[in-house]
Amino acid sequence: MAAQPRSGNEDHNVQIVLNAFDTLFNKRDYAAAERYWSPRYIQHSAHIPPGREGLFGMIKIMPETLRYQIQVAAAAGDFVILHGRFSGFGPTAWVVADIVRMEDGVLAEHWDVIQDEATREQSRSGLPMFGDKFPA
């Protein structure tokens, strides 16, 4: 099956999700972040408490050094998929695949797959999991 070009709405959804993640995880601007997440936000992650309040509450207790970096963002219809890296919260960063369902221009539902970032010694492929360098 040939790849289909993304629609303008898909590009817009990607930009909304990227702005939302930066606003919440990097800038810690909770008031601004509220406009990106639905009040009826559904959370499927095993690591995050339910709802928008659960997510925001978890981030509030994380260290100020928490950072999110994006490597890949793609969209299909109302779904946005990200491959990113969370660091600054402990000794090992997480490499995460996030799937977000958009509804009426806001993040409505979320799933994720999380792995500890492998060091060079741990990588059987010999390649980094995120970017072009292994963690220091």
Describe the role of every protein-language-model region.
Residues M1-A136:
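C-terminal and inter-domain tail/linker signature
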